[in-house]
């Protein structure tokens, strides 16, 4: 008889765990929401061109940083395709904008070619990259992103037009929460995803037909999926079995 395993939460981590444990264990997957997937959520939008699968959460990945996810997609025979990922900034009140497409997007506004402030900003980009890598190699006493930006005297222009809006966009955070982000976690994520490399970027991929494609593929392999079942507590019994009251 197989040992029973309960997995709480059917986001990408819960689904992948259930998929890889299903052959060795009697897996039960519990989800408080009406459907599985969590952050991996796809909405179908209809227009005059037909149906379009739009992801509202997890959208892109790359092979160097997501080898296990790529392996999961390959095991499921779920196709994926190349995609673009870029960052754009637009200050509407001042009609100031640029994007990370090098070199044209960097100078999307022609007036930036003769802007001393903007050229100093570009210099700060390279200084940020250098200091970030130095900090990762030899962490000091700085604990938050705010500490780092203040200690190295980065300009308000650099903070407000690059690092803070980009960080806020990545993690869906407010500017204040981005400032308080743990420094090493912030820099390590940027380094791992080659965001500190200003020119050479990894080739990004996206799941064909949206992330719901792999959510559905995993669910087709699972027998015991319990949606609308919120787990309220987990307690060990003397026999070391796990008791999971739910409703």
Language-model regions, residue ranges each:
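N-terminal Rossmann-like FAD-binding beta1-loop-alpha1 element of flavoenzymes
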Residues: 3-29
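Short loop/edge segments at beta-strand edges and connector loops
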Residues: 9, 82-84, 227-229, 235
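Short glycine/proline-enriched coil/turn segments at helix->beta-strand junctions
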Residues: 22-26, 219-224, 245
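Glycine-rich FAD pyrophosphate-binding loop
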Residues: 22-46
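N-terminal glycine-rich dinucleotide-binding loop that anchors FAD/FMN and/or NAD(P) in oxidoreductases
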Residues: 43-69
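Mobile amphipathic helical/loop "lid" adjacent to a hydrophobic cofactor/ligand pocket
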Residues: 63-188
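Helical element adjacent to the flavin cofactor pocket in flavoenzyme catalytic cores
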Residues: 186-234
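Conserved beta-strand-loop-beta-strand element in the redox core of flavoprotein oxidoreductases
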Residues: 230-247
């Amino acid at each position: 008889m197989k040992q029973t395993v309960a997995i709480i939460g059917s986001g990408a981590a819960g689904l992948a765990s259930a998929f890889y444990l299903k052959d060795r264990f009697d897996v039960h997957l519990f989800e408080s929401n009406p459907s599985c997937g969590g952050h991996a959520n796809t909405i179908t939008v209809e227009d005059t061109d037909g149906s379009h699968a739009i992801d509202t959460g997890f959208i892109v990945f790359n092979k160097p940083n997501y080898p296990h996810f790529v392996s999961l997609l390959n095991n499921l025979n779920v196709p994926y395709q190349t995609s673009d990922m870029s960052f754009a900034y637009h200050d509407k009140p001042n009609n100031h904008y640029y994007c990370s497409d090098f070199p044209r997007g960097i100078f999307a506004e022609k007036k930036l070619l003769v802007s001393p402030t903007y050229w100093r900003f570009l210099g700060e980009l390279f200084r940020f990259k250098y200091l970030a890598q130095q900090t990762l190699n030899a962490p000091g006493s700085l604990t938050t992103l705010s500490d780092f930006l203040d200690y190295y005297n980065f300009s308000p222009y650099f903070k407000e037009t690059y690092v803070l809006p980009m960080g806020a966009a990545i993690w869906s955070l407010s500017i204040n929460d981005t400032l308080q982000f743990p420094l090493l976690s912030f820099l390590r994520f940027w380094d791992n995803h080659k965001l500190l490399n200003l020119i050479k970027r990894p080739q990004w991929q996206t799941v064909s037909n949206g992330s719901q494609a792999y959510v559905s593929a995993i669910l087709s392999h699972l027998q015991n999926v319990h949606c609308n079942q919120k787990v309220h507590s987990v307690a060990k019994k003397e026999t070391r079995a796990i008791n999971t009251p739910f409703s």
